[in-house]
Curated annotation (Swiss-Prot):
Name of the molecule in the record: Cell division protein ZapC
GO CC annotations, alphabetized: cytoplasm
Subunit structure: Interacts directly with FtsZ.
Gene this chain is encoded by: zapC
Chief place where the protein resides: cytoplasm
Length: 177
């Protein structure tokens, strides 16, 4: 069952775990992947989960199952982390040099899923913010090794130029006649 936004939802910084969280009522608190150093100053205090946040979250609840085969719990987890990333993270500069250039020109839009190729590995990413030349993407894969010293963890974000986004490989289904 998908969690739908309620008027008592709100953002708060969870000091015990050192991450941004979403209070989903009096009983449930969802912990995002985002630590204080990556958050905007307002995210360190209690904030309403407002209409803009709810619309963004709901659009992802709608888009994700059309692209990926996921459980309802995974869709909610991705959508809440992506909403936090879109509204609560500090701006980033592109770091495209970690990734291979795509041979295909893609239309990048918020909520679309792409692959990044880095050191012969493929990483699944979700666009959470889009500009004219670049996109802020959130890692859906468990991890992506960027270099010997840097690894991107699941739900972490990185900004890349559009020419680094590779379309998802088409699934081929063989039907016996």
């Amino acid at each position: 069952m998908l969690l739908l936004p309620q008027k008592d939802w709100h953002w708060k910084y969870n000091d015990s775990y050192g991450v941004l969280s979403v209070s989903l009522g009096s009983e449930i608190e969802f912990l995002t992947a985002y630590k204080a150093k990556s958050l905007i100053p307002d995210a360190l205090s209690s904030m309403e989960f407002n209409i803009s946040h709810a619309k963004f979250y709901m659009s992802l609840l709608d888009k994700l199952p059309k692209t990926l085969t996921l459980t309802d719990a995974a869709v909610v987890q991705i959508a809440l982390n992506a909403t936090a990333a879109h509204f609560m993270l500090t701006p980033q500069m592109p770091k495209s040099w970690f990734f291979d250039t795509s041979e295909v020109c893609v239309y990048s839009d918020v909520g679309k899923v792409f692959e990044l190729k880095c050191q012969k590995q493929r990483a699944l990413v979700l666009v959470v913010e889009n500009t004219l030349q670049s996109a802020l993407v959130m890692l859906l894969s468990p991890e992506c090794v960027l270099s010997g010293a840097k690894t991107l963890g699941q739900f972490e974000t990185i900004k890349v130029m559009h020419n680094r986004l590779h379309p998802l490989r088409a699934q081929r289904h063989v039907v016996a006649a």
